């Protein structure tokens, strides 16, 4: 069975999990429909927060996700929206394609009724009511402002002036300048000419009981702003951390809760700090701060009605911390794990009380569920006559919060729930979730059978744009019996029934395989590369990079195993690298990535998913007596005085729990952490490298030479070790990284990377786990890529041949008999696929891999990581991989040691490719494909992509880039793919391919 939507609103996800959002009796699931298109293509993504009005009759739903670049389904014109003047609240002359939303629902009856939808260009999680229910406030995210809306009749209207927080310049413009981040005005900022500065971003906010004070978390400035709501002015900014400070505290403040006195005036604010794993208690009169350690990566807060207890959702710890607000001490930690389970991954990320506060409901983003927590001692079970009293009467009685609290059940939801609220009666849950399956059908109807949906003209087909948010209305379960059944379903949906099952193939191979080489590539779907295979379920009409350009991808699939039902779990690189390195994500990533790629457009927020934080490498020290890109952070190079130092310590704000901890008793972290805990050896080639030194000042600069306009630039060298030019400032595995193996850089050649890998392996040998990055199938930097690799076709061929050479080399080494090569794309966001936008290529190559086989078992990135763990005999990292299935169907117990023979893509053997790049081109005996011609030359590609930035993966309009790729390779007259059938095309392949060749 492929990843798909099934009848009865059941969905199989690319993470390997199943969601059943309407399983609870009486529940309903609806998309967050905007009504802008009849096919739902412009419906909302990324529902992140709910807020119920003080009278309990109205609920707000906020999105912060990928909500832009949609088109009119008839004309194809971009859907645009007026940007409000922040001073007047009136539409300005500026319009935008950005469309975050506030949905206003009437929840006063049993029916959920949408009353209004309000467009806001940028948001980031924060939304709060005024205590009289006549106004609400919305954080404007990267726009560094807070929007205010007031009730006027039955609708809410802009209530200007909006609250300008004052970090970014040009604040009163419809859009500010995005320059107000933490490093603004520092010596490093001055020395870099503004290159290291990022923008500000406002996240959570809350309002005092008298409505006079609002407090907002400045997510990228490590501070809170205190606002007088009457004047709309910031009265003070309380800074937790400033550049140059030696103590890490209050960094990445996310959520805010305000405590008020008996008169309703604000007295304290509690703020979660996501990097420092703490809640800050801030006295608003004196600015005194108490630091309260809690669990890892805390996110949302919930204050009891009497304000005596504060509940903290700890996303990376699977716990809830309970703080006594009188003493500012943690008095209880509630585990959300199953009894005795040491693995984490539930990801608690929002909280709500029952009306009497006897129960706590916690959304579990990682389990697609809501946990039900008894906050007091569990009542003795009564006889069956008790079951009619309702869940709360049956299960709970009021108890002091200091008494042990426990999870009594879980309720299934949609994919990645982000917020839960209750109606006034307390008998109905409202849960919003972030996303849904993208599916083969761009209409993305939840119950549309595969093969029936067609891609309407002018759709945005980017995978983030296809994953839609939803809202579930769930009656509180009527009895423990019902809750128990739902809990068992949540366990089943998350694979707990697979836990502990012995796999005899893995047990056998665990004694055979001693070396795993893990290769991660970039962004291609199955159909883009392998749609033209003579076997498997591929659509040749969608094949962009066929066999002559990617012969080794094709030959490896045909010689070993074709995996035609494999899915990358992540949508894009940030999420994809999380899944590829630890089989999970964090709540930070899930909230952050879609906004960064979407409406933020890499402004304000930064790419914090591969070891760097705020574009800084926390793995290196702040200063050094011998400063270089390998010994010190970029801020230390720019400002040796230390005045510009930020992020004290080595913690990565987005690292998984357990990362960097090699104690054998610890679980979690990255794949390499588990290997090192098990006593294995690890060598890193290109994973998690600081990319700050790879950008030339223009696309015309020779990348093999120093850049006079950018003294930080590290030149590319085909022989970096011999030239003594370190290429790779590592963020992790500092002493286990080949610093001459360059990280992600589209100007570089993957064949250069292969040559450096080979040099290092010949010197240091083959470790237990090798981490190898070959990124050139991402494509880019066509203006000044090295070695004449200035077209998509030549860059793909470069990537293909590097992969082929690596497998050939390994298959001829003495260790081959106990080696396995795993090759995966981190994500497959950059192209079409007729089955699902997450379906991609993957390979497992070893002496024990089946030969000339097609394996159509549904596998995902999580299964891939799980299989590596099983072969190496190392510990699992979290719930996902511990519950996953190893990819046993790929293997046989009969070893075949026949070495692999790589094939030279013929396009690499002709101008303008550097003749020195591939010596085998001169070998008449070397297998080669026909030397196909690139449809366009490098100048065409440079011109067609001149608006795109390739210095960091995905920092561009991916949908537009995909269209450039298609027309550039297929030709301007080739229609962009308009149909994804979802059909099984594995039969009658010869006829299908003949029709394709003749078309």
Enumerate the predicted regions with their spans.
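Predominantly soluble domains enriched in secretory-pathway, periplasmic, or organellar proteins
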Residues: 1-503
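N-terminal pro-sequences and low-complexity stem/linker regions of secreted or lumenal proteins
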Residues: 467, 483-999
């Amino acid at each position: 069975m492929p990843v798909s939507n099934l009848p009865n609103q059941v969905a199989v996800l690319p993470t390997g999990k199943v969601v059943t959002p309407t399983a609870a009796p009486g529940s309903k699931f609806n998309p967050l429909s905007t009504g802008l298109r009849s096919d739902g293509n412009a419906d909302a993504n990324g529902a992140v927060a709910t807020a119920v009005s003080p009278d309990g009759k109205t609920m707000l739903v906020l999105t912060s996700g990928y909500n832009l670049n949609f088109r009119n389904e008839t004309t194809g014109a971009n859907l645009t929206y007026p940007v409000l003047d922040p001073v007047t609240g009136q539409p300005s002359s500026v319009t935008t394609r950005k469309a975050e939303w506030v949905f206003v629902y009437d929840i006063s009856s049993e029916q959920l009724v949408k009353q209004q939808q309000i467009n806001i260009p940028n948001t980031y999680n924060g939304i709060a009511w005024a205590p009289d229910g006549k106004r609400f406030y919305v954080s404007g995210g990267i726009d560094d402002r807070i929007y205010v809306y007031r009730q006027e009749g039955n609708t809410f209207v802009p209530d200007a002036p909006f609250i300008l927080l004052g970090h970014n310049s040009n604040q009163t413009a419809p859009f500010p300048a995005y320059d107000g981040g933490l490093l603004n005005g520092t010596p490093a900022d001055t020395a870099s000419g503004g290159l290291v500065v990022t923008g500000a971003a406002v996240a959570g906010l809350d309002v005092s009981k008298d409505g006079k004070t609002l407090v907002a978390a400045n997510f990228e400035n490590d501070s809170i702003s205190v606002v007088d709501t009457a004047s709309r002015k910031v009265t003070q900014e309380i800074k937790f951390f400033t550049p140059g400070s030696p103590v890490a505290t209050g960094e990445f403040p996310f959520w805010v809760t305000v405590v008020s006195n008996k008169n309703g005036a604000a007295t304290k604010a509690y703020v979660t700090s996501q990097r420092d794993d703490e809640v800050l208690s801030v006295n608003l009169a004196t600015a005194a701060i108490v630091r309260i350690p809690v669990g890892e990566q805390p996110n949302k807060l919930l204050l009891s009605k009497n304000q005596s207890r504060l509940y903290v959702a700890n996303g990376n710890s699977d716990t809830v911390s309970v703080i006594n607000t009188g003493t500012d001490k943690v008095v209880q930690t509630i585990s959300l794990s199953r009894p005795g389970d040491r693995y984490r991954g539930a990801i608690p990320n929002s909280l709500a009380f029952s009306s009497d506060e006897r129960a706590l409901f916690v959304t579990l983003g990682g389990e697609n569920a809501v946990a039900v927590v008894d906050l007091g001692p569990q009542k003795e079970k009564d006889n069956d006559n008790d079951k009619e009293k309702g869940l709360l009467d049956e299960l709970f009685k009021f108890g002091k919060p200091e008494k042990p609290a426990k999870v009594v059940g879980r309720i299934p939801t949609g994919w990645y729930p982000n917020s839960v609220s209750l109606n006034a009666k307390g008998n109905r849950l409202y849960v919003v979730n972030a996303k849904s399956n993208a599916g083969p059908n761009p209409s993305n109807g939840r119950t549309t059978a595969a093969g029936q949906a067609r891609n309407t003209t002018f759709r945005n087909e980017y995978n983030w744009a296809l994953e839609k948010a939803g809202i579930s209305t769930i009656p509180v379960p009527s009895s423990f019996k019902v809750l128990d059944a739902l809990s068992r379903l949540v366990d089943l949906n998350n694979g707990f029934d697979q836990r502990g099952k012995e796999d005899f193939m893995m047990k056998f191979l665990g004694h055979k395989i001693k070396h795993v080489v893990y290769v991660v590539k970039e962004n291609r779907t199955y159909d883009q590369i392998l749609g033209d295979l003579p076997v498997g379920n591929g659509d040749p009409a969608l094949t962009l990079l066929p066999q002559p350009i990617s012969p080794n991808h094709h030959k490896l699939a045909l010689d070993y195993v074709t995996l035609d039902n494999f899915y990358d779990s992540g949508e894009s690189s940030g999420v994809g690298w999380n899944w590829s390195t630890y089989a999970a994500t964090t709540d930070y990533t899930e909230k952050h990535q879609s906004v960064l790629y979407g409406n933020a457009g890499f402004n304000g927020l930064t790419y914090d998913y591969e070891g760097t934080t705020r574009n800084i490498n926390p793995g290196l020290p702040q200063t050094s007596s011998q400063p270089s890109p390998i010994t010190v952070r970029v801020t230390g190079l720019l400002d040796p005085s230390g005045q510009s130092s930020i992020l004290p310590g080595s913690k990565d704000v987005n690292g998984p729990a357990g990362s960097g901890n090699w104690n054998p008793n610890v679980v979690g972290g990255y794949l390499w952490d588990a290997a090192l805990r098990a006593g294995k050896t690890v060598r890193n080639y290109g994973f998690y490298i600081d990319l700050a030194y790879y950008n030339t000042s223009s696309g015309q600069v020779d990348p093999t030479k120093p850049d006079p306009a950018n003294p930080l630039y590290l030149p590319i060298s085909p022989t970096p070790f011999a030239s003594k030019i370190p290429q790779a400032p590592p963020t992790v595995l500092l002493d286990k990284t080949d610093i001459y193996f360059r990280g992600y850089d589209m100007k570089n050649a993957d064949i250069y990377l292969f040559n450096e890998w080979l040099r290092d392996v010949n010197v240091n040998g083959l470790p237990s786990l090798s981490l190898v990055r070959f990124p050139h199938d991402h494509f880019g930097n066509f203006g000044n890529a090295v070695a004449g690799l200035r077209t998509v076709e030549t860059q793909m061929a470069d990537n293909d041949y590097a992969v082929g050479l690596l497998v050939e080399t390994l298959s001829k080494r003495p260790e081959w008999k106990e080696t396995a090569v795993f090759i995966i794309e981190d994500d497959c966001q950059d192209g079409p696929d007729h089955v699902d936008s997450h379906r991609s290529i993957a390979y497992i190559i070893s002496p024990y891999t089946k030969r000339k086989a097609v394996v159509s078992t549904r596998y995902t990135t999580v299964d891939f990581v799980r299989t590596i763990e099983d072969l190496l005999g190392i510990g699992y990292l979290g719930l996902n991989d511990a519950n996953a299935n190893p990819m046993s169907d790929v293997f046989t117990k009969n070893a075949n040691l026949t070495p692999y023979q790589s094939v030279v893509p013929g396009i690499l053997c002709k101008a303008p490719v550097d003749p020195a790049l591939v010596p085998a081109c001169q070998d008449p005996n070397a297998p080669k494909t026909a030397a196909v011609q690139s449809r366009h030359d490098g100048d065409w590609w440079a011109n067609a992509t001149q608006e795109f930035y390739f210095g960091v993966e995905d920092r561009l309009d991916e949908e537009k880039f995909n269209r450039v790729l298609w027309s550039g390779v297929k030709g301007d007259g080739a229609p962009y793919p308009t149909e994804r059938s979802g059909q099984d095309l594995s039969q009658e392949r010869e006829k299908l391919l003949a029709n394709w060749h003749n078309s």
